[in-house]
Amino acid sequence: MAHQKLESVGSGMLDHRVRPGPVPHSQEPESEDMELPLEGYVPEGLELAALRPESPAPEEQECHNHSPDGDSSSDYVNNTSEEEDYDEGLPEEEEGITYYIRYCPEDDSYLEGMDCNGEEYLAHGAHPVDTDECQEAVEEWTDSAGPRPHSHEAEGSQDYPDGQLPIPEDEPSVLEAHDQEEDGHYCASKEGYQDYYPEEANGNTSASPYRLRRGDRDLEDQEEDIDQIVAEIKMSLSMTSITSASEASPEHGPEPGPGDSAEACPPIKASCSPSRHEARPKSLNLPPEAKHPGDPQRGFKPKTRTPEERPKWPHEQVCNGLEQPRKQQRSDLNGPVDNNNIPETKKVASFPSFVAVPGPCEPEDLIDGIIFAANYLGSTQLLSERNPSKNIRMMQAQEAVSRVKRMQKAAKIKKKANSEGDAQTLTEVDLFISAQRIKVLNADTQETMMDHALRTISYIADIGNIVVLMARRRMPRSASQDCIETTPGAQEGKKQYKMICHVFESEDAQLIAQSIGQAFSVAYQEFLRANGINPEDLSQKEYSDIINTQEMYNDDLIHFSNSENCKELQLEKHKGEILGVVVVESGWGSILPTVILANMMNGGPAARSGKLSIGDQIMSINGTSLVGLPLATCQGIIKGLKNQTQVKLNIVSCPPVTTVLIKRPDLKYQLGFSVQNGIICSLMRGGIAERGGVRVGHRIIEINGQSVVATAHEKIVQALSNSVGEIHMKTMPAAMFRLLTGQETPLYI
């Protein structure tokens, strides 16, 4: 039903300029950069097909079973494919998303981040840390991310390296890529396609539904800076360079033979028509037996690759035109050890050409691009929160359809009033879908009407035979604030973002939605391959099984449970005298988050009592619990003791050094934490490091019996990356370490 065309585009360097096509009433074609009024526009005289009644899918629905029967409404959302303009603030917490706690050694503070978005974790944008101690290190965040639900949502993770690709819950190849400012990727479910696309329909086989298309190489978008271009190249893994060729006209195009179409999807039942325009909307392809020299059908021979060429292809893309990544200040111990030292380009060729990605298309066909025939109904613009719920997304899609319908009706009335005769026919377009971008081409001239990078697509819904495509507006950095507005009555701090909504009509509406979802999955797999990661090594189920078999390292629990270590102390002091202590946080990841005694003033009440030791954890003071309170609050409580003469403390006697035991069965399992200058600065929740007792903000003192206090950062990273089996470490709070080593002057309270 749909054809494939080979799209000759460079890696993320497509021309975003709009080339006008013969659309009704000479309207200006649009791109993702142009401004639209909130009411949008449609070609005059366009008639909207009847909208099938649709109710939004319930929130708890995790998977749509796409079958030919019943309601075909489905929707895709890519909440994480944010452009840089929308990176202000972290997304709201959603279930199933991995959280991290970031420790900043410069100011002893903690930052909580979701998937480390905005924290610059990928090897393409980490901000230098303002400290002389920072050592250069190569970023290696290749976490095995938590699974993503398949309710056509792409939650978590954009971008390609400015963002993160969505990760399917049931997809065996799962990993988290960090610092994805735009996070755009979707991974489709493995279910729901076999019944909808059988190998044979009524016993008859037909030609491939897709065909490839050739096009001229487009120029680089002038408004994107080089970082965005590099990011798009790295993440999208755009198609290999193809010799540019002019579009063949319908009369002079090469006659396609039975072998000219690449077999993209299992053939599906389709009615054949001798002319494209007699039965719109129709897929572009006709079965071979229906083709004859008189047909005005456009046909293009796809460029094929031999099995020997395909493994080399991602390598060529990665190496073509890329700048060297910026130097990093952190090392994230989450990938196979060979990621540290072996150049990624040496590993790509050994991986399978393509990993099976659930969906109606073959992965290689989505790399090259596929074409769907559709009718363009119109576009409008909506204001939306950054990460609305799925139900709100569906309501927005229905609102866009309603607006377009109203505008069509108004245009029809205007035509009738002006006695201009019948309304013009619908604008026929080719919807080009690839793992890099989505383009809308005029069906007759093949000129670009709209062009959106895949990472900017936030949502797609099919409602009956209507397809709604939502994309984030792409603005220059200097104008990034222009796309953020606040609507009257909106909650304070709730920013509104401009979304451009395109509405199409097609018999293949559901297939289009599924194909775009699969394109996100393919883009994610190609991102892994470009970064030297074998997707087949990243089975989330296998990693989850390992986690489930490991028990929490309970050294702390045993220590806290021992009543001999829990003490209630009474300290005497003079009125107006400070307690004379320095306290620091125990560190996120500790079994009881409280404050630790890091230093005592000589001759002060705490030191005079002889009952306290450095490393003791303070549970309460004068009956006020300190567990779970911020450090500043705890310090304020201690300062409030100045005018008292007696202080009652509940403490747990602890050594200043914490013992950690990480069980890593194989090098392919990520450790799940990152290190900066020997300090643990982030930790993956639920990973083997957290289970082993790793704490954010702690300084690594010893690894497997070897002191690393004076060891260079790179050697610490190498030692951890190469460790397998049981990894024993000793750590202490970084602030305590600096006090004990004289790097900081204590401020007693």
UniProtKB/Swiss-Prot annotation:
Residues 81-94, 131-142, 218-227 have a biased composition (Acidic residues). Residues 568-653, 659-735 form the PDZ domain. Residues 185-270 are annotated as: STXBP1-binding. The keyword Transport applies. One of its GO terms (biological process) is chemical synaptic transmission. Residues 366-555 form the PID domain. Keywords: Phosphoprotein, Protein transport, Repeat, Transport. The modification Phosphoserine is found at S11, S208. It comes from the Eukaryota. CDD domains: PDZ1_APBA1_3-like, PDZ2_APBA1_3-like, PTB_X11. The keyword Protein transport applies. Residues 1-94, 130-343 are annotated as: Disordered. Pfam families: PDZ, PID. Residues 305-315 have a biased composition (Basic and acidic residues). GO terms for molecular function: amyloid-beta binding. One of its GO terms (cellular component) is plasma membrane. Putative function in synaptic vesicle exocytosis by binding to STXBP1, an essential component of the synaptic vesicle exocytotic machinery. May modulate processing of the amyloid-beta precursor protein (APP) and hence formation of APP-beta. This is Amyloid-beta A4 precursor protein-binding family A member 2. It comes from Pongo abelii. The lineage of its organism: Eukaryota, Metazoa, Chordata, Craniata, Vertebrata. The gene is APBA2.
